[in-house]
Swiss-Prot record:
<dbReference type="InterPro" id="IPR011542">
    <property type="entry name" value="SUF_FeS_clus_asmbl_SufD"/>
</dbReference>
<dbReference type="Pfam" id="PF01458">
    <property type="entry name" value="SUFBD_core"/>
</dbReference>
<dbReference type="InterPro" id="IPR000825">
    <property type="entry name" value="SUF_FeS_clus_asmbl_SufBD_core"/>
</dbReference>
<dbReference type="GO" id="GO:0006979">
    <property type="term" value="P:response to oxidative stress"/>
</dbReference>
<comment type="similarity">
    <text>Belongs to the iron-sulfur cluster assembly SufBD family.</text>
</comment>
<comment type="subunit">
    <text>Part of the SufBCD complex that contains SufB, SufC and SufD. Can form homodimers.</text>
</comment>
<dbReference type="GO" id="GO:0016226">
    <property type="term" value="P:iron-sulfur cluster assembly"/>
</dbReference>
<dbReference type="InterPro" id="IPR055346">
    <property type="entry name" value="Fe-S_cluster_assembly_SufBD"/>
</dbReference>
<protein>
    <recommendedName>
        <fullName>Iron-sulfur cluster assembly protein SufD</fullName>
    </recommendedName>
</protein>
<dbReference type="InterPro" id="IPR037284">
    <property type="entry name" value="SUF_FeS_clus_asmbl_SufBD_sf"/>
</dbReference>
<dbReference type="GO" id="GO:1990229">
    <property type="term" value="C:iron-sulfur cluster assembly complex"/>
</dbReference>
<comment type="function">
    <text>The SufBCD complex acts synergistically with SufE to stimulate the cysteine desulfurase activity of SufS. The SufBCD complex contributes to the assembly or repair of oxygen-labile iron-sulfur clusters under oxidative stress. May facilitate iron uptake from extracellular iron chelators under iron limitation. Required for the stability of the FhuF protein.</text>
</comment>
Amino acid sequence: MAGLPNSSNALQQWHHLFEAEGTKRSPQAQQHLQQLLRTGLPTRKHENWKYTPLEGLINSQFVSIAGEISPQQRDALALTLDSVRLVFVDGRYVPALSDATEGSGYEVSINDDRQGLPDAIQAEVFLHLTESLAQSVTHIAVKRGQRPAKPLLLMHITQGVAGEEVNTAHYRHHLDLAEGAEATVIEHFVSLNDARHFTGARFTINVAANAHLQHIKLAFENPLSHHFAHNDLLLAEDATAFSHSFLLGGAVLRHNTSTQLNGENSTLRINSLAMPVKNEVCDTRTWLEHNKGFCNSRQLHKTIVSDKGRAVFNGLINVAQHAIKTDGQMTNNNLLMGKLAEVDTKPQLEIYADDVKCSHGATVGRIDDEQIFYLRSRGINQQDAQQMIIYAFAAELTEALRDEGLKQQVLARIGQRLPGGAR
């Protein structure tokens, strides 16, 4: 089996964690496990994994521990937001910590039924891992024409354990947004403590005709965590989806967003902000298929890299043969804050249709000394001047958050990751 030297040990451990659940697992979960074992783990020789270090994770002793937390512990980690909140701890749904959903506009059922779930747009090994080890699926539905008054907040709390063991938690959600429906869904990932843990996340979303989705992801886990996520968006005709990801925490954080525009006149916006500090690595990946004509997509991905951090961006737009009048743009802007900070960026276009308008671009730079000088000349000290420029760089993304309270909490998290902040 191709892969890292210790990959067989990691695969065996994950296999044991799967078998520890007994015979109650779905056939689909078993199929993903078999695919995981057949595929093996990649090495740096694999192009898509060249810049994502796995050694620190693979050499671990994995456990699956379901902890109990109090409402007070939940509240200490929670967002201040008027929402319908579902709480998951160490991969498991906790009704006692969650809000009731009756009358909310969201129909929620949690089970291991996976027969109706969409196939992966871009499958890879950690997607198979999460699909196999996630113990249940959160099925969420918003009926035709419904517009829930409050956003749905999916809060994920994962604990690390003392010693060399790494707690492993996997979360699997699916949302069906029916024709003409409109909803906001927020994914919030936090750590219960400062110890190492490994989070896997998978969220698939069907956006039906004339439906409108606002999706926000907040990855705020601790500096020792590993986080691998795979979100799939499938849009029908005249559908709209806006997805905003703020990737602000984790030793290694790799987030994949894969999208299919399967109906004409659909509109897509995908934005992300990554801020690796110290020795952290944040890898952001997008895969977009323009499968029908007359669709519009815009992507803006920004990174602010400090110390010895590394940011990776890999994005691809694929325009199918008959997807005429496609309008797609993808931009990746990177700001280096440390002399040893690194960025690796690879935006790509694959166009098989005529009469389209597509572009991609990437920039990598540092703070302009003239900007600092201008602010210093007006009595602003060096650190404050630097922070003003960074906030301005991030503002294009944070301003997309409609809720002012949520925006301020994201800005506070950004502030913690700036030079001088409590990282």
